[in-house]
Amino acid sequence: MIDDDGYRPNVGIVICNLDGQVLWARRYGQHSWQFPQGGINAGETAEQAMYRELFEEVGLSRKDVRILASTRNWLRYKLPKRLVRWDTKPVCIGQKQKWFLLQLLCPDADINMQRGGIPEFDGWRWVSFWYPVRQVVSFKRDVYRRVMKEFSGVVMPLQETAAQRSASAHRRKRG
């Protein structure tokens, strides 16, 4: 399903933990890392696609997460010319994405990249909130910057709360 401008509708998923860190996933058999993402099927809403992709790519279900936010608008990126498949019709020149910010509600051990069938990722880790903006492949960087800027107002309070919890625990240990 490609729109008239050549963009494939897609969802992107940012999963954060209670410390305000985000899940960063390594593409299967590659050295590149990114957030989970995937196409929206015909007849599927963006939210339905997000939950399907969440299971397929990370092995989590609706009960394992809580939606904290979604982007107000669709965000687009163009593929580099070397990645465009010119022999397909219609030609897909890039992705238009609706992004979701999710809070992880289950233990980290429930994350399973193999659960959803053919794995798209072979590893993951928690990273600081802004880390992905600097590390993602260059043609996705502007979208990542815009997504993280939009979601920062939701995640920053989580980080402040985590810092307060940590300071409180440290004081209890010393006292």
UniProtKB/Swiss-Prot annotation:
GO terms for cellular component: cytoplasm. Gene3D superfamilies: Nucleoside Triphosphate Pyrophosphohydrolase (3.90.79.10). Its cofactor is a divalent metal cation. A motif (Nudix box) lies at residues 38-59. Pfam families: NUDIX (PF00293). Disulfide bonds: none annotated. Keywords: Hydrolase. GO terms for biological process: mRNA catabolic process. It is an enzyme of class 3 (hydrolase). Residues 6-149 form the Nudix hydrolase domain. Its EC number is 3.6.1.-. GO terms for molecular function: mRNA 5'-diphosphatase activity. PANTHER family: M7GPPPN-MRNA HYDROLASE. Accelerates the degradation of transcripts by removing pyrophosphate from the 5'-end of triphosphorylated RNA, leading to a more labile monophosphorylated state that can stimulate subsequent ribonuclease cleavage. HAMAP family: Nudix_RppH. Belongs to the Nudix hydrolase family. RppH subfamily. NCBIfam families: PRK00714.1-1, PRK00714.1-4, PRK00714.1-5. This is RNA pyrophosphohydrolase. It comes from Sodalis glossinidius (strain morsitans). The gene is rppH.
